[in-house]
Amino acid sequence: MAEVANNEQQAPQFNIQRVYTKDVSFETPNSPAVFQKEWNPEVKLDLDTRSAKLADDVYEVVLSLTVTAQNAGETAFLCEVQQAGIFSIAGLTEPQLAHSLGAYCPNILFPYAREAVGSLVGRGTFPQLNLAPVNFDALFAQYVQQRQAAAAAPAAEEANA
């Protein structure tokens, strides 16, 4: 009887319902002067992910990229893209679900966000910008370790008190 109950547990399911651009911004605050200078930029990439439960087994994941290019001490451009997706995810344990929302879904969204950034930079008439792949699995593992360390720190302080 227990075997039948275990077999009736929901098998893991993952479906992409939709991938869409949630927000886009491109600024060239120092144009046209920035185009007159030799192009030797310092490019900085900041990224963030967040997720929200929309319904039972339905989640929105948003990957935010901010790319800032500094050239000759001035901001050449600032590009912000929020690439989002709606995913149906069922039959996973809490740790598996957290990994899916924090690493697997952002891995799916990143190529779309990278293309949007590249397109916006090109439309700004700047040289082509190819963002390197991001290891979201490693970033998520680092995030989990930081959370565990933060949770352990207060417990250690209480034990010493």
Swiss-Prot record:
Keyword Chaperone assigned: yes
Sample GO molecular function, one term: unfolded protein binding
InterPro entries: SecB (IPR003708), SecB-like_sf (IPR035958)
Highest taxon, organism lineage: Bacteria
Entry-linked Pfam families: SecB
The entry's keywords: Chaperone, Cytoplasm, Protein transport, Translocation, Transport
GO cellular component terms given for this protein: cytoplasm
Compartments, as annotated in UniProt: Cytoplasm
One BP annotation, GO: protein tetramerization
Keyword NADP among UniProt keywords: no
NCBIfam families xref list: PRK05751.1-4 (NF004393), secB (TIGR00809)
Subunit (UniProt): Homotetramer, a dimer of dimers. One homotetramer interacts with 1 SecA dimer.
Annotated family: Belongs to the SecB family.
Record's function text: One of the proteins required for the normal export of preproteins out of the cell cytoplasm. It is a molecular chaperone that binds to a subset of precursor proteins, maintaining them in a translocation-competent state. It also specifically binds to its receptor SecA.
Name of the molecule in the record: Protein-export protein SecB
Record organism: Shewanella sp. (strain ANA-3)
